[in-house]
A protein has these predicted regions:
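Short, acidic/polar
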Residues: 360-373, 467-476
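An acidic- and aromatic-residue-enriched active-site/binding cleft used to recognize and process polar
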Residues: 121, 129-131, 175-177, 184-186, ...
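C-terminal substrate/ligand-recognition segments
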Residues: 354-356, 364, 370-373, 383, ...
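Conserved, mostly hydrophobic/aromatic
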Residues: 280, 371, 413, 520, ...
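Catalytic core of carbohydrate-active enzymes
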Residues: 523, 529-532, 541-549, 564, ...
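N-terminal accessory segment at the very beginning of proteins
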Residues: 26-338, 342, 346-347, 356, ...
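Aromatic- and carboxylate-enriched substrate-binding clefts and catalytic-loop regions
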Residues: 131, 140-151, 200, 377-629, ...
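Bacterial Sec-dependent N-terminal signal peptides
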Residues: 1-29
Length: 784
């Protein structure tokens, strides 16, 4: 009976997802004739040039109920008509009369719902449908939203004035800005509190002044399967700059770029692919947008037309949160919806030592001994792919012949002050001993017949039974004494798969990292209350609740260093407080020079890990390198009170520890241009040496800056500065009070009763800072 019940359940799940997944094949596997490889990032813009599709252009607001905050937008039906002019072939949108039968059953120019509400005085939400069918999923069921947002009870009474309707528009206002819905031509106009237009949607009549017949705000109905996708198009103003979109390795300012928001394995931070795309961005004009969707999005920020943001969404509805304010305001508002990063345990801010890979108990214990022998402050030993019986073959068990007493090993490491992290992944090859069980129990993503869509069994984390099975395996390791788990991969959920959620891969592919992060983080937190932490590679909107993440497989060269720094800054501009990277790069043994210059960036990040192709251990490289490694580690451990307080502040406010200058100095135009320096917290500026040598040009925001190593004072503006003993430029903001601790070899030995407050003062009348000790409930503001 169990077998029959299981088979029936699987058939129901497959049938449930069938319609959606059929559309996925049409939309995703081949876009406008472009064949995509499995899990390749998708360019959704190609669908919006397909002559076989029907195009519906937002035209007018035909009705609106201000009491309900909803109305109807009429969409005019068009087709793309080929046009030849002096041997140049193109297309223009041309009005179309439908040939659908029976014609009385359908609308040529449908009127479809729009809904608007204020969430807070700084956040408005606008939803638009492309079909008469209202989606069934509620906010309470959405995994991208945090629990606090789900629990909210309607609009805050102080969030806005009542909407005002005039002959030409409906206007929603708050103290920070307004949303104006113009009736004809239909537009959404976003203004600041002074009435300045920040951005607005494009209407077809906006093409009247140009030969470029740019498609305005529209949606398509595909000729292949009648599926729909929406294309919001907004104004991009002269001088406008766009930031965010996740852990992007390209230039921080996305204007001029085409950004694909689909989770992929880019094979490193030197390409335009992303392990961690996030459908959120903000502008230097004072607004931000969260595209609430899990479907792929291609953001054309002025790449094809310099005056437009073209958001090519695979989703059939638009659900946008629009934020008002400066970067800190916007990040706080966004993370109030999708969640803030939790405060992480003190030990996690220490040094993590790893390589690919330690293969035995003795090897792990020897690494711990060498760290203590060489007096390198450290807190974590990580075992990567080699702790199983067969390398890379995850079965949640230590290899018996190489790990004679894993529990004893974990106890010894703990006694010596080390926490232990283990690698794993959610894919099971046919040779894995769990493969038959996963298939038999239906714990994997399936295809249209209930079989395998790809070579491996990929755990389906939308299935509660899969989550329970997976967490039981991890829990066994936790009970042995493991502290945390590396949450590797997660980018390969098949687009053509069928998921227990009832959704196809179009909507589940990007959600996969979020579900994976959540399942792992929750079991770690359950077994180590208050110390929930993972080490994850992939992410989506909301994954910041399940910290932390690292930058992936960087090349061991200057470009790998640049890509990681850009990625970390962009990730921080997307709502993630904590982030790390592999010091020296990952792919091959790191040359000593690049590894040495990478060290300060690693130790002045929220989390610090040496990992990659061996050797990563400093004593195996050279004596001088060991000294340099030790110097950087000692610097961070002495700065641990500053690190810990800044981390707490970031977790409460949705701010990044590795912080682009524009976040801290939004009124400094030069700060918006910098992408090879960063603020470590709010008071320390770090400029890594991006090339060989010991000197570099640095941009400093207005004011005085004190060299952390020499005490020399610099004025704001461009300066050429020589690095000190630590191979990086490290400067402290004038008026900073930085708490330091006596040197300790492990975080649990830090003497918090002997904190030294160091004042960095040039012109400032006083020095201020933050202090937060283990056991404290609130951050203390300190002053001297």
């Amino acid at each position: 009976m169990k077998i029959v019940h299981f088979q029936m359940k699987r058939m129901i799940v497959v049938a449930w997802a069938l319609c959606g997944a059929m559309a996925v094949n049409a939309q995703i596997q081949m876009n406008a004739g472009v064949q995509y490889l499995q899990c390749m990032q998708k360019d959704m813009s190609t669908d919006f040039y397909d002559l076989s599709n029907t195009y519906f252009l937002a035209d007018s607001l035909v009705s609106f109920d201000t009491a309900k905050g909803e109305g109807l937008v009429q969409w005019k039906r068009y087709r793309l008509s080929p046009r030849q002019a002096f041997n140049l072939n193109g297309y223009w949108p041309v009005r179309m009369q439908m040939l659908d039968f029976p014609d009385a059953a359908y609308e040529n120019d449908p009127a479809l719902k729009i809904k608007i509400e204020w969430i807070t005085p700084r956040t408005a939400r606008i939803r638009m449908l492309t079909t008469p069918v209202v989606p069934k999923q509620s906010d309470a069921d959405d995994v991208m939203f945090c629990e606090a947002f789900k629990a909210r009870k309607g609009q805050s009474p102080s969030a806005s004035q009542a909407p005002r309707e005039s002959r030409d528009a409906v206007t929603y206002s708050s103290p920070y800005g307004s949303i104006e819905i113009q009736k004809y031509p239909w537009r959404i106009v976003v203004k600041d509190a002074k009435g300045r237009i920040l951005t607005q949607t494009r209407h077809l009549i906006d093409n009247d002044s140009t030969q470029v017949k740019l498609l305005p705000f529209s949606f398509i109905k595909r000729g292949s399967d009648n599926s729909r996708s929406v294309n919001p198009v907004l104004l991009l103003s002269p001088g406008e700059r766009i930031y965010g979109c996740g852990e992007s390795f390209t230039s921080l300012n996305k204007v001029g770029q085409k950004v694909h928001l689909s989770v992929t394995d880019p094979q490193g931070p030197e390409t335009d692919g992303m392990y961690k795309p996030v459908p959120f961005y903000f502008s230097n004009r004072g607004y931000g947008i969260f595209m609430h969707t899990s479907a792929p999005v291609t953001c054309d920020f002025g790449a094809s037309y310099i005056g437009a943001q073209r958001l090519f969404m695979a989703d059939e509805q638009m659900d946008f949160f629009i934020f008002f304010g400066e970067p800190k305001d916007i990040l706080n508002e966004y993370t109030n919806i999708t969640g803030k990063s939790p405060m992480l345990p003190l030990w996690s801010f220490g040094t993590w030592m790893s390589r690919i890979t330690y293969f035995s108990q003795e090897e792990g214990l020897e690494i711990a001994r060498q760290l203590r022998k060489n007096k390198i402050p450290s807190d974590v030993i990580h075992f990567d792919t080699g702790w199983f019986g067969v390398d890379w073959q995850c079965d949640y068990e230590f290899a018996k012949e190489r790990f004679k007493d894993p529990v004893g090993m974990l106890k010894q490491l703990s006694k010596d002050g080390f926490h232990t992290c283990l690698w794993q992944l959610p894919y099971f090859t046919p040779k894995n001993r769990f493969f038959p069980e996963i298939i038999e129990k239906g714990l994997h993503v399936v295809n249209a017949t209930g079989g395998m869509p790809v070579e491996d069994a990929i755990l389906d984390f939308s299935n509660p039974e899969t989550v329970n099975w997976y967490q039981s395996k991890i829990e066994g390791l936790m009970k042995q004494g493991v502290s945390t788990i590396k949450c590797d991969f997660g980018e390969a959920a098949p687009y053509n798969g069928f998921y227990h959620s009832g959704k196809g891969g179009l909507y589940e592919h990007n959600l996969y990292p979020l579900r994976y992060n959540k399942a792992l983080w929750e079991v770690v937190e359950k077994n180590h209350p208050g110390e929930g932490i993972i080490w994850a590679r992939s992410a989506w909107a909301g994954s910041q609740r399940y910290a932390l993440h690292w930058g992936g497989d960087a090349a061991t060269n200057n470009i790998g260093l640049l890509g990681d720094l850009r990625g970390g800054l962009s990730f921080g501009l997307s709502g993630f407080s904590f982030w790390s990277h592999d010091m020296g790069g990952f792919v091959t043994a790191s040359p000593e020079d690049i590894y040495r210059r990478w060290l300060p960036f690693g130790f002045l990040s929220s989390h610090t890990r040496a990992h990659g192709a061996p050797p990563t251990e400093p004593w195996l490289i050279s004596e001088s390198f060991t000294d340099a490694f030790r110097d950087c580690a000692e610097m961070k451990y002495k700065l641990m009170p500053y690190v810990y307080a800044q981390a707490k502040d970031c977790s409460e406010r949705g701010l990044p520890m590795v912080r682009a200058l524009l976040v801290e100095f939004p009124h400094d135009k030069g700060a918006w241009l910098v992408e090879d320096e960063y603020m470590f917290g709010s008071q320390i500026l770090v400029a890594p040496l991006m090339e060989s040598g010991n000197i570099r040009d640095v941009y400093l925001p207005k004011g005085k800056w004190i060299d952390y190593q020499t005490g020399k004072v610099y004025e704001g503006g461009y300066q050429t500065i020589e690095a000190g003993k630590i191979p990086a430029i490290i400067l402290v903001r004038d008026g900073s009070l930085i708490p330091h601790a006596p040197l300790a070899q492990r975080t649990d030995q830090i003497n918090w009763n002997k904190i030294e407050l160091k004042a960095y003062k040039a012109d400032a009348s006083k020095c201020t800072g933050l202090l937060f000790k283990p056991g404290d409930k609130n951050i203390k503001k300190i002053e001297q």
